[in-house]
Amino acid sequence: MKINRYMKKSVITIKSDQPVSDAIALFVTHPIGMLPVIDENNKLVGVLALEDVLHLVMPASFDLVKDLDFLHDLGATENASPSSEELHQPVTNIMTSPNSTEIDFTLFHAAAIMTKHGMQDLPVIDHDGKLVGLLSHVDVGRGLIARWHLQATCKGKQE
């Protein structure tokens, strides 16, 4: 089961030299949690997760704290916002290195990468490193259960 049957081919991206404010605008206007970061040749150079942007205003220990009232008392309120300097910096300053898969790999391979790295979305590249799609954990799950459903249906007809 090849990835290209299940991936999204229309992907919202951001260029590596665009400011963080542009990324924020994309996160606000589209139901996405991750932006593939591409260069001028459409090559994947990184990923920018919504969490990367949120960490601009959240304390570094935010992920470790379970008591949100405690954070509120320390001043990490919903009114916090990034500074002008943080908003105007290029996304390359806060993006992370991309994990990706190639278009001719299987869903099982993609699932292994996503599980290993705790990813919800996985950029798909061609042999030249150019972004050609995005595969979500839902896409992978749908593809896998479709195969199981087909096998069960065929087996049921044989009996």
List where the protein language model places each region.
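A short, polar/charged loop-to-alpha-helix boundary motif
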Residues: 54-69, 140-154
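A contiguous, mid-protein "functional segment" used to position or interact
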Residues: 54, 123, 128-130, 136-138
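Short hydrophobic beta-strand motif reused across regulatory alpha/beta modules
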Residues: 46-51, 133-141
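Bateman/CBS regulatory modules and CBS-like beta-alpha motifs in cytosolic regions of diverse proteins
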Residues: 1-32, 38-40, 44-45, 70-113, ...
